[in-house]
Amino acid sequence: MIVTTTNNVEGHTIGQYLRIVSGETVAGINMFKDIGAGFRNITGGRSSAYEGEILQARETALKEMVDRALEMGAHGIVGVDVDYESLGQGGMVMVSATGTAVTFQ
């Protein structure tokens, strides 16, 4: 399946716009990772623990979106956007991926 942030796919003609599809996931960052990230923030380093959690959450949201598009017979998803939202003070992050499921001629 072709998944792109653009509104068209070079070499393909969109036959039908099916509907908006999305995938969401919530990632929780645990206390031990928070402590390590806090230390890295003080010393100016990057927190690979947080980066890994965010990467995994993004991949999960994208996979969920693709699975929903496949269920409706889509050949691709165009106009994909990935958003990140902090949920409260508890270290929770929601990642959502949205796009338009399409078929190609």
From Swiss-Prot:
InterPro entries: UPF0145_dom_sf, UPF0145_YbjQ-like. It holds the Pfam family YbjQ_1. Gene3D superfamilies: Hypothetical protein apc22750. Chain B (3.30.110.70). Disulfide bonds: none annotated. Belongs to the UPF0145 family. This is UPF0145 protein jk0060. The lineage of its organism: Bacteria, Bacillati, Actinomycetota, Actinomycetes, Mycobacteriales.
